[in-house]
């Protein structure tokens, strides 16, 4: 009787475990190294936020924040509006700000289902007492987009991605 119970339990685990495994595969994510090279601007460290933008141009998710002091997040105006409407714990995806001429390498995680599906990565940048760049860099979230070097228009000189 004990063996019959064990076999039944094993059968149920295998049968019911398959949908969960399938669900986990559809929500799988890939980690990428993101290297940001800054221009040689003069001034304080730049606060930069990397956001996932949907096909309609709306913010969907914060992927990384460079700049640890929350009191300056309001300088990233468009992202801060999104954050106010849809608060999320970003402590695990927050790092140091980046100064002029420096580079930063961080790891970001992107859901595989978002690749080649009309999404973009937006890099917003702000420096104290200087211009705010809502779209310093915007990269199509495609295989080709992540494979190439993307030039910035503000404090960011360029961004490159590589598989982690």
Features from the language model and the residues they span:
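Short, solvent-exposed aromatic-acidic interface loops
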Residues: 39, 63-70, 141-143, 158-162
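Contiguous beta-strand segments within globular domains
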Residues: 26-48, 54-56, 61
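N-terminal, polar/charged subdomain of small-to-medium soluble alpha/beta proteins
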Residues: 53-56, 142-144
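Structured domain cores in non-transmembrane regions
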Residues: 55-118
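Glycine-rich, aromatic-bearing surface loops/beta-hairpins
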Residues: 110, 116-118, 125-164
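Intrinsic-disorder/low-complexity, polar/charged segments enriched in Ser/Thr/Lys/Arg/Asp/Glu/Gln
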Residues: 29-33, 103-107, 136
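Conserved beta-strand and immediately adjacent loop positions that scaffold enzyme active sites
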Residues: 48-49, 122
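Bacterial Sec-dependent N-terminal signal peptides
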Residues: 1-28
């Amino acid at each position: 009787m004990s063996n019959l119970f064990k076999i039944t339990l094993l059968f149920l685990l295998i049968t019911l475990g398959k949908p969960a495994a399938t669900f986990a595969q559809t929500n799988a994510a890939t980690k990428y190294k993101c290297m940001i090279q800054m221009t040689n601007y003069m001034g304080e460290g730049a606060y930069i936020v990397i956001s996932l933008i949907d096909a309609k141009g709306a913010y969907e998710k914060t992927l990384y924040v460079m700049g640890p002091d929350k009191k300056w997040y309001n300088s990233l105006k468009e992202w801060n509006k999104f954050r106010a409407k849809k608060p999320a714990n970003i402590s695990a995806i927050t790092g140091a700000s980046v100064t002029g001429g420096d580079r930063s390498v961080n790891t970001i995680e992107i859901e595989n289902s978002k690749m080649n599906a009309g999404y973009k990565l937006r890099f917003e940048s702000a420096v104290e007492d200087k211009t705010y760049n809502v779209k310093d860099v915007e990269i199509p979230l495609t295989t080709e987009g992540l494979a190439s070097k993307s030039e910035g228009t503000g404090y960011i000189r360029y961004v490159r991605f590589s598989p982690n």
